């Protein structure tokens, strides 16, 4: 059975019409913070309700999609996460296979209201809700309520009620990994609306089983099965069809690529909204199974650092690491490491357009988040069981032996990287993060 984290709310969230405008009110829950007197996160008007509905439908299509699971597994659908803060409302979700991540950012200019408090909650997108969203018109009066135990969409002639769903643990792990990739990604291509539509018309039919590349041919961008200079690699190209319903409404498209081609992100700009779609390297690889966060989590986090960070994050809702290296925060030298650690915990998302982290208040204790990764727990157990032995350590090179199941693994860490004789490293060569034996050796060295 899939592991889930269940939480509830003391008050409902509501999206309703007031003076001909939409007002969105999001309630909160947290197991680490006491409830406040604020009834919701955000109260205000949504200036583009039709576009919001179209984007939420596209996000829902991502959530109910899977590119490596059976129909029986697809019956276990889950629903998006919503964050409000820094004068923005963000909707996030993963495909069920966790290999596609989507986010809708509604920017300050697209909202007219008050942020009473920042926070994160969940919403429910089952079929009755999707059907109601699909029928929304520009001039229609719409009320959406997201409460403790139910979600309601109130239209002129009907009312849709959906029950809440638990939050998948897979999503917490995916939220952490994908932000690490986003923070390392760079803008590779910018396309106009016409260029984007021309490019997407050239998508191959059916499921694509080989890698494709986005290349420049003359002054046009094209998909090609042949790699060329400055091309970016796209695994599972057919997954981009999830963006097709939004293409008629965009102003432009920007494509961001990870330096090692571990992910690509396709960001659509639509007035005061941005919709981004991130693809994992391959269809069968979900972001939740990636090891991008393991090194950061393995270094540990001082609770005093977290307390100071939380104060700053809750006040500003955006993270500028320069703050921690300023005179007032000179005590913290590893600013990049701290940012990576917090992103690895799912507490930070990354905004590609602005090049900054935004704060996401996950409603779970640190110990629960840190306990989600089996490789990290496996590494800690190897240390507790005294199965790590340092053979030599000199001139920037460390060699260690780690006891496995009836075999001794050799771990070498030097200037050229990290290597292990285990099956995991032989199969993935470090592309999916370090194995538990490498993690154990690195943590053991930190403890010495």
Residue ranges and their predicted role:
Residues 1-448:
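Long, low-complexity, compositionally biased intrinsically disordered regions
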């Amino acid at each position: 059975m899939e592991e889930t984290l269940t939480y509830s709310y003391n008050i409902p969230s509501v999206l309703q019409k007031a003076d001909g405008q939409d007002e969105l009110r999001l309630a909160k829950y947290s197991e680490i913070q006491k409830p406040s007197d604020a009834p919701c996160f955000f109260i205000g008007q949504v200036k583009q309700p039709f576009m919001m509905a179209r984007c939420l439908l596209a996000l829902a299509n991502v959530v109910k999609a899977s590119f490596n699971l059976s129909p029986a597994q697809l019956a276990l659908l889950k629903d998006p996460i919503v964050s409000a803060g820094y004068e923005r409302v963000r909707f996030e979700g993963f495909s069920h296979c966790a290999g596609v991540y989507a986010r809708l950012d509604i920017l300050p200019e697209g909202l007219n209201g008050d942020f009473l408090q920042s926070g994160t909650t969940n919403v429910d997108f089952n079929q009755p809700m999707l059907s109601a969203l699909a029928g929304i018109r520009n001039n229609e009066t719409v009320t959406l309520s997201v409460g403790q135990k139910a979600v309601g969409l109130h239209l002129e002639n009907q009312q849709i009620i959906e029950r809440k769903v638990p939050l998948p643990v897979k999503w917490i792990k995916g939220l952490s990994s994908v932000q690490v990739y986003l923070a390392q990604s760079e803008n590779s291509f910018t396309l106009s609306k016409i260029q984007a539509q021309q490019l997407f018309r050239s998508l191959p039919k059916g499921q694509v089983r080989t890698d494709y590349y986005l290349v420049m041919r003359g002054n046009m961008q094209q998909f090609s099965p042949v790699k060329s200079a400055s091309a970016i690699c796209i695994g599972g190209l057919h997954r981009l069809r999830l963006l097709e319903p939004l293409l008629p409404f965009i102003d432009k498209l920007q494509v961001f690529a990870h330096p090692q081609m571990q992910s690509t992100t396709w960001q659509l700009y639509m007035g005061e909204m941005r919709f981004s779609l991130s693809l994992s390297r391959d269809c069968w690889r979900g972001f939740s199974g990636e090891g991008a966060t393991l090194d950061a989590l393995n270094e540990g986090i001082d609770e005093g650092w977290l307390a100071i960070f939380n104060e700053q994050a809750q006040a500003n809702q955006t993270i500028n690491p320069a703050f921690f290296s300023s005179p007032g925060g000179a005590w913290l030298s590893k600013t990049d490491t701290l940012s990576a650690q917090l992103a690895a915990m799912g507490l930070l998302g990354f905004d590609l357009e602005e090049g900054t982290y935004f704060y996401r208040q996950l409603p779970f204790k640190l110990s629960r988040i840190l306990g989600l990764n089996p490789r990290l727990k496996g590494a800690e157990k190897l240390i507790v069981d005294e199965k790590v032995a340092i053979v030599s350590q000199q001139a920037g090179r460390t060699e260690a032996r780690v006891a496995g199941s009836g075999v001794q693994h050799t771990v070498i860490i030097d200037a050229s990287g990290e290597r292990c004789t285990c099956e995991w490293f032989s199969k993935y060569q470090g592309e999916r993060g370090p194995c538990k034996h490498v993690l154990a050796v690195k943590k053991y060295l930190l403890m010495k």
